[in-house]
Amino acid sequence: PFFLFLSFLEPHFQNCFDDFPAPDIYKNIPAGYMPPDLGSLKGTAWEHLSGYYGMVKRLDEALGRIRDALKSLGMEENTILVFSTDHGCHFKTRNKEYKRSCHESSIRIPLAFYGGPFTGAGKLREKVSLVDLAPTLLDACGIPVPADMQGRSIMPWVRRETTTPSGKDIFVQISESQVGRAIRTDRWKYSVEALDKDPIQDAGSPEYTETFLYDLEHDPYELHNLIHSKAHEKVCEVLAEKLKRCMTEAGEPAPVIHPASKENMGQLLVFEGEENL
C-alpha cells in the first residue's frame, strides 16, 4: 500500500501574465458572464478569470496523466483518487487579496473521490470539512479510525448506510489576512475577527468581534451583511454559542465574542467590495 499527496502550483498566479489559454468552451464566457458573487463587487475577476479557467484546465490534464500512470502500472483498480483543494478564490472582491475570508468563494471547495468503494456517479448532499478526509480514507481502506482523530468518516453516506443529513456545522479558521473564525450551517454564515491582533504573529485570541452574518437561503451570493440587523440578534447569539463549541472542540479556549458595534461599523462593512481598508 502507498499514500501519495500531490500539490500543484496552479491555479496560483506564478507570473504576471494571464497566459494560460482558457478551455474552448469557457474562453468567451468572461466577456459576457461573471458569477454573481464576483460580478456584483469590485475585484480583479474580469481581468483574471479567463486565465484562472486555463489553469484549472491544466489541473484537469494533470489529473488525467495521473490516471494514465496508474493504468499503465496496473494499479488503478486498487487505488483511491481524491481531488480537492485548500481554498477557493474571490479575486479581491472581499478583501485586498484572493482568499482568506469566510465567504463561499473562499471556503467552498471541490471534493471528488474515485476508485475503491467510490463506485458509480453521484453527489453527496452533506457538508464535509477537510478534517473529514483522513477518517474517511482510513474507513474506505478498512482501517479503524482512531477515537481521538478529528473529523468523521463520510463513508456511511457513501455506502448509503444512512441518508439522513448529519446537521454538522463547518468550522473555519482564518489567518494571515485576519485572525478570524467562522461557522457555516445549512442556512447561516457567521464570522468573527480579533480586530486588535496581528494575523501574521497571532494564531488566536481570547476576544473576537462579530463581522459578518449572511442568510445563505435568501442571499446565496453573500451580498447583504446582516451583522448589524436588530432582527437577527437572536440568530447571532445562537451562532456565537455554536462557534464557541467548535473552537473548544478544536482545542482553542472559548472566547468572548463582542457584538458588532457602531464604533467599528466602518471597519466591518468595507469588505463588501471596498479595497481601501
Task: Show where each model-derived region lies.
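Active-site-proximal cap/lid insertion segments
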Residues: 1-130, 140-148, 199, 204-207, ...
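Protein kinase-like catalytic core scaffold
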Residues: 2-4, 80, 170, 189, ...
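Short, solvent-exposed loop/turn segments at secondary-structure junctions
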Residues: 8-13, 87-90, 97, 118-119, ...
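C-terminal, low-complexity/hydrophilic appendages and adjacent surface loops
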Residues: 101-106, 174-228, 234, 263-269, ...
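C-terminal helix-rich "cap/oligomerization" subdomain common to oxidoreductases
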Residues: 239, 243-257, 266-272
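Non-transmembrane alpha-helical segments in soluble domains
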Residues: 53-56, 60-71, 134-138, 142, ...
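Polar, surface-exposed loop/tail segments
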Residues: 77-79, 121-183, 232, 237, ...
